[in-house]
C-alpha cells in the first residue's frame, strides 16, 4: 500500500513539473459566407453603393444589379464586423455631381448600357452606429456592339468615351449655343463631353451628353464680357443632338439641360461614413483627414477607391491572341496579402480617445462564396452580367 502511494505521489510531482506544449498563434476568425439575396445583405449593399457614388467626382451614378458575393469577418467583441462585397452594377443616367440616390435614377436603355463590377470593404459597428467604407474598386465597360446589332440593329451606335470624331464636339458646341440663345439671362460654357453616340436616321445624327458651367457673363454683355474663371465648377448636364436629314440643307439641333442641386452635400469627411453622429463632427472629420494622409505606417493609411473603364468587349476580342477569350473584369482590392490579416486603424471613427483597430484580410475569391450567391439580377440580360 505504501509503495502504491509513493508511486502516485511521484507521478503527481512529475506532472506538476511538466510544462504544457506551446499553443499555436491565434488565427483570425474565418469569413462567413452570406446569402446574397437576404434583406440584411441588400441593405449593406445599398449603403456601400451610396458611399461609392458619393465619393466619386466624375462619371455617372452606379445602380445595383445584383450582389455577386458577400462575406462577413467578425471582429473582437465591441468592434463590429468587416464585410467584403462584390457587386454587379449598371450605369444610370444621373451624373454623380447631381448627388442623386441610385434608387432614384433610371438605368440606361440596353443599347446605351455600361455595366461592371465593384469590390468593396465595408466596416459596420452597430453599437457605435458606425458605417464606414475604407476601400473600393470598380471596373466598367460598355455593352458589346455586336450584342446591340444582334438585338437591335436600328439602335444608335454607342461610343461612350470616343471624342475622336469632330462631329461630337460640333454637336456639343452648337446645341449649347442654341441653349444660350434661348436663355433669358444666364450664359453657360462647355466643361467636358461625357457621352457620345451616333445613328443614321434619314441622314447622320449625333448625340452627346456634356457638363456645363455658369459664365459670369449675361446675354446683354455680349463679346465685352471677360472669360470665366478657370476654377468654376460644373452646374449641370446637357443632352444635345445634331441631325442632317438627306435632302435638307439645314441642321436639326435639339438640347435639354438639367441643373445640379446647388446645396452642397452633407459633409461626411474625406471618406464617407453613414448614420454616424459624433458629438463633435468637425473633430471627427479632422481626425479622419489626418488618418487618410500618407504615412509610413500601412496600418494607419486608409485607401480611397477608383473606377476604371474598359473598352467595348468586341475591341478586346479583336486584339486578343486567344481563339475564344473569356470576358473578365480585373477588379483588384487587397489592403493586404497576408493570409493572417493586418490591422487597420479605425480610431478616428470613435468618439472615445482610444486606439481601435480591426483585422483586415485579403479579399476573398469567389470560389468560397455562398450557394445563394450570386443573387438574382434586376436586369438579367446575359450581355450585361459580368462572368
Swiss-Prot record:
Q: Where is this region: Disordered?
A: 264-306, 366-387
Q: What start-end ranges are recorded for coiled-coil regions in this protein? A: none
Q: Which UniProt keywords apply?
A: Disulfide bond, Fertilization, Glycoprotein, Metalloenzyme inhibitor, Metalloprotease inhibitor, Phosphoprotein, Protease inhibitor, Repeat, Secreted, Signal
Q: Which residues carry this modification: Phosphoserine?
A: 320
Gene3D superfamilies recorded: 3.10.450.10
Q: Fetch the CDD domains from UniProt.
A: CY (cd00042)
Q: Does the keyword Secreted apply?
A: yes
Provide GO CC annotations from the record. extracellular region; extracellular space
Q: GO annotations under biological process?
A: binding of sperm to zona pellucida; negative regulation of endopeptidase activity; single fertilization
Compartment(s) where it occurs, according to its Swiss-Prot or TrEMBL record: Secreted
Which residues pair up as cystines? 94-105, 118-138, 152-155, 217-225, 238-257
InterPro entries linked:
Cystatin_dom, Cystatin_Fetuin_B, Cystatin_sf, Kininogen_Fetuin_HRG, Prot_inh_fetuin_CS
| Family stated for the protein in its record | Belongs to the fetuin family.
Q: Describe its function.
A: Protease inhibitor required for egg fertilization. Required to prevent premature zona pellucida hardening before fertilization, probably by inhibiting the protease activity of ASTL, a protease that mediates the cleavage of ZP2 and triggers zona pellucida hardening.
- This one is known as Fetuin-B
Q: Which organism is it from?
A: Bos taurus
Amino acid at each position: 500500500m505504501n509503495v502504491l502511494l509513493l508511486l502516485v505521489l511521484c507521478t503527481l510531482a512529475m506532472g506538476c513539473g511538466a510544462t504544457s506544449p506551446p499553443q499555436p498563434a491565434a488565427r483570425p476568425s474565418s469569413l462567413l459566407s452570406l446569402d446574397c439575396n437576404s434583406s440584411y445583405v441588400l441593405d449593406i449593399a445599398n449603403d456601400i453603393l451610396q458611399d461609392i457614388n458619393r465619393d466619386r467626382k466624375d462619371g455617372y451614378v452606379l445602380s445595383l444589379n445584383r450582389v455577386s458575393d458577400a462575406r462577413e469577418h467578425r471582429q473582437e467583441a465591441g468592434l463590429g464586423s468587416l464585410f467584403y462585397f462584390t457587386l454587379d452594377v449598371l450605369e444610370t443616367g444621373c451624373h454623380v455631381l447631381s448627388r442623386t440616390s441610385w434608387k432614384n435614377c433610371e438605368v440606361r436603355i440596353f443599347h446605351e448600357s455600361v455595366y461592371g463590377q465593384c469590390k468593396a470593404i465595408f466596416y459596420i459597428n452597430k453599437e457605435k452606429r458606425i458605417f464606414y467604407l475604407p476601400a473600393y474598386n470598380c471596373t466598367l465597360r460598355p455593352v458589346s456592339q455586336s450584342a446591340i446589332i444582334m438585338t437591335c440593329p436600328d439602335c444608335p451606335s454607342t461610343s461612350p468615351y470616343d471624342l475622336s470624331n469632330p462631329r461630337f464636339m460640333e454637336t456639343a458646341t452648337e446645341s449649347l449655343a442654341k441653349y444660350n440663345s434661348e436663355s433669358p439671362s444666364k450664359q453657360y460654357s462647355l466643361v467636358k463631353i461625357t457621352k457620345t453616340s451616333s445613328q443614321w436616321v434619314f441622314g447622320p445624327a449625333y448625340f452627346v451628353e456634356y457638363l456645363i458651367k455658369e459664365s459670369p457673363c449675361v446675354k446683354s454683355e455680349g463679346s465685352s464680357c471677360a472669360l470665366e474663371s478657370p476654377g468654376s465648377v460644373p452646374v449641370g448636364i446637357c443632352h444635345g443632338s445634331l441631325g442632317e436629314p438627306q435632302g435638307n440643307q439645314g441642321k436639326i439641333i435639339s438640347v435639354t439641360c438639367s441643373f445640379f442641386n446647388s446645396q452642397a452635400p452633407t459633409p461626411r469627411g474625406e471618406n464617407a461614413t453613414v448614420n454616424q453622429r459624433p458629438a463633435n463632427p468637425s473633430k471627427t472629420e479632422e481626425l479622419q483627414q489626418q488618418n487618410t494622409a500618407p504615412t509610413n505606417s500601412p496600418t494607419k493609411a486608409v485607401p480611397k477607391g477608383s473606377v476604371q473603364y474598359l473598352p467595348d468587349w468586341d475591341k478586346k476580342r479583336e486584339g486578343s491572341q486567344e481563339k475564344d477569350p473569356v470576358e473578365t473584369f480585373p477588379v483588384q482590392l487587397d489592403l493586404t496579402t497576408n493570409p493572417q490579416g493586418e490591422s487597420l486603424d479605425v480610431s478616428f471613427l470613435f468618439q472615445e480617445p482610444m486606439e481601435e483597430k480591426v483585422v483586415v484580410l485579403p479579399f476573398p475569391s469567389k470560389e468560397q462564396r455562398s450557394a445563394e450567391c450570386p443573387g438574382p439580377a434586376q436586369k438579367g440580360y446575359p450581355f450585361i452580367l459580368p462572368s
